[in-house]
Amino acid sequence: ADHVPDEAAAMINCAIATAAGALRLAGDLSQGRVLVLGAGALGLAVAAQAHAAGAAHIAVVDPSPSRCERALPFGAACARTAVDPEQRYEVAIDCSGAPAAMRAGLRALEVGGTAVWVGAVLPQPPVPVDAEQVVRRLLTIRGLHNYDTGDLVRAVQFTEAHHRTYPFAELVQARFPLADLDAAFAHALATGPWRVGVALREPD
């Protein structure tokens, strides 16, 4: 939609749509407790959509304190550098791809809880799973790679409705014209921003 800033709209077909798919697999989050592992753009999108879906409590975990702080405007009730061993959640969504985080998410689930793994998109060491605990605690593990058409539609609708509530546009920390694509890549490598925008055309 025209009223959505380019910077926010640019997040739709990656982080926001993938997050919509993760929430689809997670099921009804209303009044639930949700753990989000990883506070990159995907983790922030998951937190924001869980918040908009009515989750009662959203905890975001990331080893980076600055990323934890960034999660708070996206609906996180708390953000920590490690999982609190005293807390339990109905849903744990891993956006990090780190085996240790996925294991921590399983340990943090309530009986009957659901783990959704989204971040493991590259080859990595296997994740040891305690089958007895999965069986006794009635756990569900679901994986998602990319998103479907319905997820993309929901991502567009979410962004139209909530782009002023959750500051996705602020994640695009630099903007370059298409003619300066090499400079955009160089800037991204040198500074490590959340996102770098490349404008296919500049506003009239």
Where in the sequence are the language-model features?
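A short acidic, Gly/Pro-enriched loop at the edge of an enzyme's catalytic core
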Residues: 84-92
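Glycine-rich phosphate-binding loop and adjacent beta-alpha segment
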Residues: 99-161, 201-204
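Glycine- and other small-residue-rich loops at beta-strand/loop junctions that grip anionic moieties
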Residues: 39, 60-61, 93-94, 118-120, ...
